[in-house]
Each structure stands twice: as structure tokens, then as C-alpha cells.
Amino acid sequence: MPYRKYREKKYEAKYREAFRAFQQKLGITFTNEKLLIQAFTHSSYVNEHRKKPHEDNERLEFLGDAVLELTVSQYLFQKYPTMSEGELTKLRAAIVCEPSLVRFANELSFGSLVLLGKGEEMTGGRERPALLADVFEAFIGALYLDQGLDTVWGFLKEIVYPKINEGAFSHVMDYKSQLQELIQRDGSGNIEYQILQEKGPAHNREFVSRVTLNSVALGLGSGKSKKEAEQQAAAEALRKLKEQS
């Protein structure tokens, strides 16, 4: 056997062992292990090893991107029943953006498993954010093809959804959503908004709103619309709760 082929087989055997250990760590066993390996195969590796172009992870990345958007959308839709479409979209974008995906990938040491060409390896590709985000999406695509949506949901429940529950993305929410998320996380009870006052002429109305937690007043706010008044009341409530914590 030519030395080059011997070296490649030894290299691939080492990675197969690493992928088995990775599956044990996740508690997931792929029926088709080739899908798992493909999810971590960068185009530079395919080019250098004269493999077919479709054997890299780009198609799986395409699929995983769609699966990730669907599952995260469903989770947010169920978790925040009163959140507006605009706020849901903004929150989802923060969860599936490149920096977030890189964070998830790094927590599971995805970079150490990526199959790279020598050039990409030498230029630090293993730690390149865009590459890691792509690999995370490709892994989601491979997991979906191999085991279906339920397993993807279970994986995200362990890796991604806890970050949402811990408030990691609260900074992109409006004040009402932030307050709702904080109350849900602490299990403190129910919040309600009440318009206490409407004043001024029809063309220049001002509304005063109060937000309560279990019937105890948390904050007051005013604005040119009911929505704005409620947002300001929620902002005051958040300030008070953060001062108390």
C-alpha cells in the first residue's frame, strides 16, 4: 500500500474513534456514521483528498440552517405566547446568529473534530468562527436526517434552550418580554398590566399604565399609546427587580 494511502487510512481511523467518543459524550448514536463525519468535513479536506465535492458539509449546513430556524421558532412560539412577531424574529436571530452558534460549537469542542485540509489547518481554520458556525448547522442537518426532528429537539433542549431560560438573550428583547422572561425564570407568579389613566386631547393622548406581580405593584409608566405606557412600566419594574437582586 502506498505510504500516502496508509497515512490517510490511519488518519481517518483516528477520527472515527474520536467521533465514537463524541457520540458517547452526547448520548447519541448515529445509524449512519458517514453523515456525522460528513457534517465535520470541510471543503478544503475534500479538495486535498480528491473526494467528490458533495462529500463536504455544505449541503448539510444548508439543511441544518432550516431545521435550526424551525425548531428554535417553535420553541420561542410556545415559550412566549404573548410576544409579538417582531420580537420573536429578533430573539430568534440572536439565537441562531454566528456568535451564538460558535459558542454552542465550542462548548462541545466541535473544532477538534473538523476534518480540514492542510492549508486551512495552518491558517487557523479550526478556530475560525464562520467555519465553526457552519459545522454546528451541518451537525443539526446530519442529526435530522439520521434520527429526525425529535432527536434534534432533544439535543437543542440540552445545549441551546437552557441559554434562553438563563436570560442569555434578554438584551435583544423589549422591556415587557424581558420582564416576562425574568418572572418565568424565577417562577415568581403572574404579571398583569392595567391602564390607570387616559388624559389629554384626542390628538395628543397620554396613557398611564401599572404592572403588577401577584397583585403587587411593580412599576408605573406613561406614553403616547397604551403599548408605550406598558413598556415604560415594565422598564421601571425591571429596574426595581434588578436593584433588589
UniProtKB/Swiss-Prot annotation:
Domain DRBM, chain residue ranges per copy: 174-243
GO cellular component, one term: cytoplasm
Domain spans labelled RNase III: 19-148
EC number, as in UniProt: 3.1.26.3
Reaction catalysed by this enzyme: Endonucleolytic cleavage to 5'-phosphomonoester
Binding-site residues, Mg(2+): 61, 134, 137
Entry's family note: Belongs to the ribonuclease III family.
Protein name (Swiss-Prot/TrEMBL): Ribonuclease 3
Organism of provenance: Bacillus cytotoxicus (strain DSM 22905 / CIP 110041 / 391-98 / NVH 391-98)
